Amino acid sequence: MAAVQALPLSIDQNTEASGSQSHTNTRSPVTENTMGSVSSLISGRTYHDKQCRASEFSNKCRKPTNMPNCFKQQEGLLKTNYSSQDFLFNGLPTKKPSTTTSGNNGNYVYVNEDFKEEWHDARVPISPSSDAEDIREERSINGNIRGPPPKLIPISGKLEKNVEKTLIKPTAFKPVVPKKRNPSLQYLVQRNGGPGLSESQSSLNLLFNGNSAGIPEKHNSLSCRNIAHSGTMSDSGRTSLSSLPTSNTNCSHQLDSVSVSMGHINLDNHSNLNGYSDRASRGRTRPSNSDSGRSSSSKSTGSPILNDEILIRELEEKLKDREMELQQLKENLDENEAAICQVYEEKQKRCEQEMEELRQSCALKMKQAAQKAQRLQQVLQLQIFQLQQEKKKLQEDFSQLLQERELLEKRCASFEREQTEFGPRLEETKWEVCQKSGEISLLKQQLKDSQAELAQKSNEILLLRSQFREARCDLQISEEQVQELQDTAHTKTLEMEVCENELQRKKNEAELLREKVSKLDQEVASLREAAVASLRHGLCFCHEKEDPFLLYESDEAKAQRQNADNLQGLQQYVERLREALASERSRYQEQAEHFEDERRKWQEEKEKVIRYQKQLQHNYIQMYQQNRELERDIKQLTVELDAREFNEFDLHGAEIHFEEITATEI
């Protein structure tokens, strides 16, 4: 016996699932006489045909004639319940995960849309004869191997060295104590097998219940189905069920029949739930055939096809063996109806719970889809309204553009008529433009002359301004001189007042001196008279007594002589006073004459300054008036020049335009 590798298939959800499902249902009656699990490995057949044959084999495993009525009714209810939800699931636009079972642990996985037939992973299905360590080793090795499955050697048990690790080695069953079991199935095993189970039964029980530990009940049903298929088909390939002991084979077949019925119930339920689950689960059960079947199919797929008739004969023999096994399984199923009913009821409860969950999820998805559709409808209505508004606006714009087009056409026609009418007028205007151009040239010449005059006037204005500045400077200098003269005149008046005061004082002194002089004259006269008398009295004694008598003069003579000396001194003093008075008078007269001269000069200078100031003021007023007149003339000239330049610019542009017109006409 030789082992064969399983084909790993990546299955995604696609819209073609419903079509493929219906196609398998239509083709299933035609291929009832063939073995689906073996024929699916033959090259030259499509994946769709392989799936159809897998579904036929799963349908054959059941016993519809001997099944109780309760199973049929419950199965019909499940089918109708799940089929009623097909429209809901198929109508949703979202991506739906379809449930299928893995060949190792029975977990749910997502199904891919495109069926890629390439070999992504070299995976080996778990058989009851394989050990846990061998499985782990084979998984680690097969995870890194890619490509087509290795070729098998026709001799049983002899494999090539390079392929030895990638294939499942046929080994004997090892008794393994199961850890956790489903209560109903454990009851079946203990009741039928008892404590003395064979190696194949214990390994089947381990595979049947080992994967159910630590995962939901929903996954247990799928794992039971796959394990049942792999256990029954692979066991019959190596040794038929009839070769095992009766008690042990009965127990193992009972377990297989239970797992087969549960697998088909779950298969029917999930096939109605989603179009992909039936095909995926059937595709998963394909690798669980017998070793002999897999060896023949691997030969057919790995090597070129030798002869189709030989393969068909082999397949018919295998099919007969399977029918015998199925007959025995049906007999065992009749014996274990009560246990199967209990298991089926539990399965039905789980299915109802799943159905309720699916209904709730479906209602939620339908609600979300309805809300989404409502939002999309509102958005579309809003877009339609906006498009209608834009359409109305575009229609209005189009009508306005048509009206504008008509108006423009009318205006173009009127312009053409005016052009035909204005042709002769244009000629006249051209001649007038020529005349105006001559006038403009004259005006330009006049403008140049006026500009020259303006430049001359501006030079004169500059000269007048410079003269005005000089006159202003002279006026300031003369004003400063007048101010100085006024200051000097003021000082002179003060000096004259001082001199007048001094003169008055001198006059007063002179009056006092005159009075003194008159008094002194009187005293001198009295003294003269006394002196004359004394002289007359003393002459008589002069000759008689010359010197010696002088010594003996009397006091009266001494007094007289002293009075005479004093009188002489007074006379001299009076003479001196008279001389001083005369000098003072002469000096006073000279000062008065000098003051009069200065006064006359100051008056003359004052009159000159006044006349000069009056003349400067008159000149300043005249200059101011002239400046005002010049500024007025300059403003008028600037205004005239600006107007002429503007007119010249307009006429120059018009002249160029009309000259271009005449040139183009010529």
UniProtKB/Swiss-Prot annotation:
- Localisation: Cytoplasm; Cytoplasm, Cytoskeleton, Microtubule organizing center, Centrosome
Example GO CC term: the record gives: midbody
Compositional bias segments (type: Low complexity) = 239-249, 286-304
Q: Which residues form a coiled coil?
A: 305-647
Stretches of Polar residues bias are at 11-35, 227-238
* Keyword Isomerase among record annotations: no
Disulfide bond sites: none
Stretches for region Disordered = 1-35, 227-249, 266-307
Write one Pfam family the protein is assigned to.
Answer: Fez1
Q: Which domain of life does this protein belong to?
A: Eukaryota
Report the main location listed first in the record: cytoplasm
The UniProt keyword set, sorted, is:
Cell cycle, Cell division, Coiled coil, Cytoplasm, Cytoskeleton, Microtubule, Mitosis, Wnt signaling pathway
Its GO biological process annotations read: microtubule severing; mitotic cytokinesis; negative regulation of canonical Wnt signaling pathway; nuclear export; spindle midzone assembly; Wnt signaling pathway
What is this protein's function per UniProt? Negative regulator of katanin-mediated microtubule severing and release from the centrosome. Required for central spindle formation and the completion of cytokinesis. Negative regulator of the Wnt signaling pathway. Represses beta-catenin-mediated transcriptional activation by promoting the nuclear exclusion of beta-catenin.
HAMAP family, A to Z: LZTS2 (MF_03026)
What the entry lists under PANTHER family is as follows: ZIPPER PUTATIVE TUMOR SUPPRESSOR 2 HOMOLOG-LIKE PROTEIN-RELATED (PTHR19354), ZIPPER PUTATIVE TUMOR SUPPRESSOR 2-RELATED (PTHR19354:SF4)
Q: Which family does it belong to?
A: Belongs to the LZTS2 family.
Please state what the protein is called.
Leucine zipper putative tumor suppressor 2 homolog
What organism does the UniProt record list as the source?
A: Xenopus laevis
